[in-house]
Amino acid sequence: MTDIAVAEQTTKLIGPGRLVLVVGPSGAGKDTLINAARTLCADDPAIVFARRVVTREASAAEDNLQVTPDDFSRLEAAGDFALHWRAHGHAYGLPRGLDDDIRAGRTVVANVSRMVIDPARSAYANVVVVLITAPAEVLAARIAARARASDGSITDRVGRSVAAHPDVTISNVGDPIAHARDLLEIIRHGRPQP
């Protein structure tokens, strides 16, 4: 069972900045592309990469803040998350501070569950959803290679299907730097550039 929530909102959508939601199946390489895009635009103060708060151990490729389930529940109850969800037995949240960045006109990039897309579109004025994907056999090989205990069954993770309704899809097979450049163009412009 997955729980999702968006912070209570007023009738006005949060903007004028952009919220770029990077979604996709386990093993698609979301963190790889996000980290490479972050490096490519490190000198751009208009782009902010959200740091997720999670109740599982972060891998070397992730820039997450690990907390206990009790601490997460306290943060959640205090309203400290802009978006939060539960999936695969863990809780995930994006700090409320990202709202201030978006109000200031910055672009915020976040790796999220596909299940928070609709709540995010209901809360923010400018949301771009980027689906990172790869063929099933590539996903399975990547999940097996990282051997993260929290991944559970590889078959279940690869077979999981949640509609994303993306604005843009990147098939992450081949050169990850080229795909990171594609992602950066979307981050900067809200869509791929010709």
From Swiss-Prot:
Reaction(s) catalysed by this chain's protein: alpha-D-ribose 1,5-bisphosphate + ATP = 5-phospho-alpha-D-ribose 1-diphosphate + ADP
TM region positions: none
GO MF annotation list: ATP binding; ribose 1,5-bisphosphate phosphokinase activity
Superkingdom of origin organism: Bacteria
SUPFAM superfamilies associated with the record: P-loop containing nucleoside triphosphate hydrolases
Keywords associated with the record: ATP-binding, Nucleotide-binding, Transferase
GO terms classed as biological process: 5-phosphoribose 1-diphosphate biosynthetic process; organic phosphonate metabolic process
Pfam families with a match to the protein in the record: AAA_33
Entry-linked NCBIfam families: phosphon_PhnN
Family: Belongs to the ribose 1,5-bisphosphokinase family.
Stated name of the protein: Ribose 1,5-bisphosphate phosphokinase PhnN
Organism lineage string: Bacteria, Pseudomonadati, Pseudomonadota, Alphaproteobacteria, Hyphomicrobiales
Gene that produces this protein: phnN
